[in-house]
């Protein structure tokens, strides 16, 4: 079945590897691109530290790194995504019509109309024998939009029946929020600021571990007011929404002189304060915040958000959503929408000039040889 020539509900696989570089999330979803009819199983496979180091070395595509290095990483990551998707499909017994493949972001500079996600859609389609939609950000970026965030379309579909105004906050490496209002208002979305990236970088530098489990180190420290003020002085917070960030937009320099605990506490406060400031760009204050992404597992962040926002702040599991699978589910949903020419972004979510569809469609019989680097 060619998904582009049908309009019924189908099973789709979503594959996501985010800016936190934790690993690959895969999820199954049955949808027609408008509604979610059934949520299937999900799977997460962590990257080993060597893979994270390879990705980290190429973030921002630094000078001195060859095209061959990027292409090799793209191929290897695509093969890993194929293995994870094949496992999920095999375990579920479901035959998907399409796979939504985000790829790994190395660079995001929408002001230069540039966003780089590596991954070979043709190779993935060949390995799985399933059609693939990738390059989901490119049409928006080329049209002058931010290319991010992309998940608001999925949040909007899930939020049917929930009290509004509602904010859905994703705390991955970068924080992003979707504001959902009453009636038929289009969603408003943008990156709020740091998510877990700075805290993870701090823990790696100071303690040699990947994260601050449950915010234990942050809870042991004190917030440094001067360092927090310096962090919040970044130009990004003065820009109107819609807006988006590269993972490495912020620096650890303001906290470098602090103790391990005080630095962690200050970085948690930075994430929470940037979310609180995001309300300035919303049409109305949210009655409730639902949090997904790895940040919802950090108790120090969740406590700081509750103090700073003054309304209910809950993990998305409180309304029956799967916070670990949500972004992968979103890319399954977006793959169906993109294949059928439905909007993925709006002026209120990315600053695009009009509602835009997107994605490159690779039929299951695609021949190998297409470029593995999407620009």
UniProtKB/Swiss-Prot annotation:
It catalyses: 1,6-anhydro-N-acetyl-beta-muramate + ATP + H2O = N-acetyl-D-muramate 6-phosphate + ADP + H(+). It is an enzyme of class 2 (transferase). Gene3D superfamilies: 3.30.420.40. It comes from the Bacteria. Its EC number is 2.7.1.170. Pathway: Amino-sugar metabolism; 1,6-anhydro-N-acetylmuramate degradation; Cell wall biogenesis; peptidoglycan recycling. Transmembrane segments: none annotated. GO terms for biological process: 1,6-anhydro-N-acetyl-beta-muramic acid catabolic process; amino sugar metabolic process; peptidoglycan turnover. Keywords: ATP-binding, Carbohydrate metabolism, Kinase, Nucleotide-binding, Transferase. The keyword Kinase applies. The keyword Plastid does not apply. One of its GO terms (molecular function) is kinase activity. ATP binds at residues 18-25. NCBIfam families: PRK09585.1-5. Belongs to the anhydro-N-acetylmuramic acid kinase family. Catalyzes the specific phosphorylation of 1,6-anhydro-N-acetylmuramic acid (anhMurNAc) with the simultaneous cleavage of the 1,6-anhydro ring, generating MurNAc-6-P. Is required for the utilization of anhMurNAc either imported from the medium or derived from its own cell wall murein, and thus plays a role in cell wall recycling. PANTHER family: ANHYDRO-N-ACETYLMURAMIC ACID KINASE. This is Anhydro-N-acetylmuramic acid kinase.
């Amino acid at each position: 079945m060619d998904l582009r020539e049908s309009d019924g509900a189908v099973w789709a696989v979503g594959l996501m590897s985010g800016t936190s570089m934790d690993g690959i999330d895969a999820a199954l979803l049955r949808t027609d691109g408008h509604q979610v009819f059934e949520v299937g199983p999900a799977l997460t496979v962590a990257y080993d530290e060597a893979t994270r180091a390879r990705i980290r070395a190429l973030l921002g595509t630094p000078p001195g790194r060859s095209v061959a290095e990027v292409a090799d990483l793209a191929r290897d990551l695509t093969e890993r995504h194929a293995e994870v998707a094949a496992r999920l499909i095999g375990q579920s017994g479901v035959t998907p019509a399409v796979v939504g493949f985000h790829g790994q972001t190395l660079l995001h500079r929408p002001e230069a109309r540039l966003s780089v996600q590596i991954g070979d859609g043709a190779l993935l389609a060949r390995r799985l024998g399933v059609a693939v939609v990738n390059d989901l950000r490119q049409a928006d970026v080329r049209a002058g939009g931010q290319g991010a965030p992309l998940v608001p379309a999925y949040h909007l579909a899930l939020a049917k029946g929930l009290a509004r105004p509602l904010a859905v906050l994703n705390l991955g490496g970068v924080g992003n929020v979707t504001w959902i209002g009453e009636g038929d208002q289009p969603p408003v979305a943008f990156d709020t600021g740091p998510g877990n990236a700075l805290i993870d970088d701090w823990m790696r530098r100071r303690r040699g571990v990947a994260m601050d489990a449950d915010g234990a180190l942050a809870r042991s420290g004190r917030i440094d007011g001067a360092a927090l003020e310096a962090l919040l002085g970044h130009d990004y917070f003065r820009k109107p929404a819609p807006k988006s960030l590269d993972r490495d937009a912020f620096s650890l320099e303001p906290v470098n002189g602090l103790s391990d605990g005080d630095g962690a506490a200050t970085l948690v406060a930075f994430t929470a304060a940037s979310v609180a400031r995001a309300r300035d760009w919303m049409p109305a204050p949210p009655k409730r915040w639902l949090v997904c992404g790895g940040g919802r597992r950090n108790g120090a962040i969740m406590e700081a958000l509750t103090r700073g926002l003054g309304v209910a702040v809950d993990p998305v599991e409180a309304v029956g959503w799967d916070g670990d699978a949500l972004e992968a589910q979103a890319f399954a949903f977006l793959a169906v929408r993109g294949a059928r020419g439905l909007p993925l972004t709006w002026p209120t979510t990315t600053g695009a000039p009009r509602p835009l569809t997107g994605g490159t469609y690779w039929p299951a019989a695609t021949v190998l040889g297409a470029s593995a680097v999407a620009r």
